[in-house]
């Protein structure tokens, strides 16, 4: 992912596609007219393409907007990566404590945590935390290598029923986010379903599921996106992502003070390669979606 400090930008693909494309999953609910209008107006004013998937785990209702269209996931893929590591740790109890040494040649331009720990290395658990909470690109590549390569991450996604997630390249190449490029993409609906299974369902054992939630809740990069649109007394665990074409992404589980958790995936991408990130758009989407729940 490309960064200016800890901030991020992301992508665009196929802006002229209709609001809902292809066949939506069986769980797709009709989008309330007021929400459809608000999201369409926000998307139009921001001059980009917006994808949203929300699951209210309390009553099973969903809100979907362009949720079957592909978007470049950029660093939101690191959520799936960390989950794949946790899944492997279920059969390898010492995996998270395994010590990984790496070289200066392994360091990418965005490596805030791995650079600090170059002299003595890091454990797999520490690399996962760096990947989720600081979006450290070097940590992500080291974890992919530890799992056995890109195919291992994709195989894990398939194992939990996610047929849309596809990781084709390593960091930082996966962030080019070119329009209509299917590489390194997923759909909002697929990512929301996977988050629900991994953080709130039984795709992982309780200990691993709890650890994944802890990492998400400790994220340092999402204060201006979904968290900014949620009530301040709610707990939010998220993973942001960004790349070229001003793409700005966030995927999250929100724990209200009362009621069941909410899964929310927001992908946004723009028309120009050098477009600036729009974290404000993600915050606005969150407010629109949550207004339908309260």
Swiss-Prot record:
For the keyword Signal, the answer is: yes
Q: What S-S linkages are listed for this chain?
A: none
Quote the PROSITE patterns the UniProt record gives: BETA_LACTAMASE_A
Signal sequence annotation: 1-30
Q: Does Signal appear among the keywords?
A: yes
Entry keyword set: Antibiotic resistance, Hydrolase, Signal
Q: Name one GO biological process term.
A: beta-lactam antibiotic catabolic process
Q: What is this protein called?
A: Beta-lactamase
State the organism of origin. Answer: Yersinia enterocolitica
